[in-house]
């Protein structure tokens, strides 16, 4: 275990507490981050931003200091080896709309930024919440709901639920926040790719899965959740809060798919999807490969992105099987991330449709999977 700033870090907590505890000599301006299993460091908020700008990934675990957090055995799951519900899912895929993606992303990128501690970060989250509320109302699906999951910072998480007949839960998530690494609070951060693209992809998938006859008839075996996370750019803050809570509550999360960066295609080079192979669940990754082969039109290749590179890591460290399908084989190919240049003009909406196909395939197949 690597310890810095003269602090002895002995344990972590399951759930966030009202006021983070800090050891003697560590001021309120310091945050505890985890850069790898057992590798922790106390840093300032500015240092966190500089580390993210330099490509260093981590989880902010300040709220876990001194409270006995332990890793958990992975929740067991039994994934289908082949697609069994193409007749239900392919009509939904055919109804996916590139125009919806463009419209929603245009609105989302008009906020000055979606930084998790800024007023516009709250305004953008409120806009997403309102879209989800409208989608549910228009669908007429009984039992479908959306709620806020609040954090200790301004921006809130959003959780939409489609109930199934079992307690087993399948999740797709995307972080909603954006950041300008040079000026986090006030700087322009349209965040079109990072991660407006993932935000609107799962919004469009949610819009269409509610049109499923099986969902409308309440025939889903497993509960589905769509998550929009706050504060990813601060160290996976919102997603870690959720999955710590789910762990403490004994939730049976059988699968989590992360959608972060879904629109950049590396200047016209052959398109592919990137399946992140590190800090993910191998069995679920194999299921993702099958889903891509069955429902997408481009190939998938394995890649690595390091510890805590995105919100799937929050599920993974809390014992829930997680996968991450990104836009390319190498996560950082988009040179505009965390700048005012991360704009819609750099994105490929056809590529984003491929991600939406994968999300619908993933959620549709697992919604109906028996004995998951």
Curated annotation (Swiss-Prot):
Disulfide bonds join 305-309. Its cofactor is Zn(2+). Zn(2+) 2 binds at residues 194, 233, 338. Zn(2+) 1 binds at residues 175, 194, 260. Binds 2 Zn(2+) ions per subunit. Residues 1-18 form the signal peptide. One of its GO terms (biological process) is proteolysis. Its EC number is 3.4.11.-. Pfam families: Peptidase_M28. Keywords: Aminopeptidase, Disulfide bond, Glycoprotein, Hydrolase, Metal-binding, Protease, Secreted, Signal, Virulence, Zinc. GO terms for cellular component: extracellular region. Probable extracellular aminopeptidase which contributes to pathogenicity. Belongs to the peptidase M28 family. M28E subfamily. This is Probable leucine aminopeptidase MCYG_03459.
């Amino acid at each position: 275990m690597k310890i810095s700033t003269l602090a002895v870090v002995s344990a972590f907590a399951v759930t966030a507490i009202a006021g983070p505890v800090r050891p003697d000599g560590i001021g309120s301006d310091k945050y505890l981050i985890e850069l790898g299993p057992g590798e922790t460091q106390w840093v300032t908020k500015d240092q966190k931003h500089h580390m993210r700008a330099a490509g260093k990934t981590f989880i902010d675990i300040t709220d876990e200091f001194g409270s006995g957090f332990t890793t958990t055995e992975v929740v067991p799951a039994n994934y289908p080896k082949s697609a069994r519900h193409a007749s239900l899912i392919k009509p939904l895929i055919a109804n996916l709309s590139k125009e919806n993606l463009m419209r929603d992303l245009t609105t989302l990128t008009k906020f000055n930024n979606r930084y998790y501690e800024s007023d516009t970060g709250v305004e953008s989250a409120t806009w997403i919440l309102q879209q989800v509320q409208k989608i549910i109302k228009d669908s007429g699906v009984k039992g479908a709901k959306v709620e806020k999951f609040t954090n200790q910072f301004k921006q809130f998480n959003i959780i939409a639920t489609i109930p199934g007949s079992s307690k087993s839960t399948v999740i797709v998530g995307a972080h909603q926040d954006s950041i300008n690494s040079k000026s986090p609070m006030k700087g322009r951060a349209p965040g079109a790719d990072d991660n407006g693209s993932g935000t609107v992809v799962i919004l469009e998938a949610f819009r269409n899965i509610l049109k499923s006859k099986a969902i409308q008839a309440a025939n889903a075996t497993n509960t589905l959740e769509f998550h929009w996370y706050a504060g990813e750019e601060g160290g996976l803050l919102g997603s870690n809060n959720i999955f710590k809570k789910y762990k403490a509550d004994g939730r049976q999360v059988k699968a989590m798919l992360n959608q972060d960066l879904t629109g950049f295609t590396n200047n016209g080079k052959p398109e592919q999807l990137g399946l992140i192979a590190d800090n993910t669940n191998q069995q679920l990754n194999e299921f993702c490969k099958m889903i891509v082969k069955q429902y997408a039109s481009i190939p998938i290749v394995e890649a690595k992105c390091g510890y805590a590179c995105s919100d799937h890591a929050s599920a993974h460290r809390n014992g829930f099987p997680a996968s991450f399908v990104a836009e390319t084989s190498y996560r950082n190919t988009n040179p505009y991330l965390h700048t005012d240049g991360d704009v819609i003009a750099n994105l490929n909406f056809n590529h984003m449709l491929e991600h939406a196909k994968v999300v619908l395939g993933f959620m549709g197949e697992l919604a109906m999977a028996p004995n998951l």
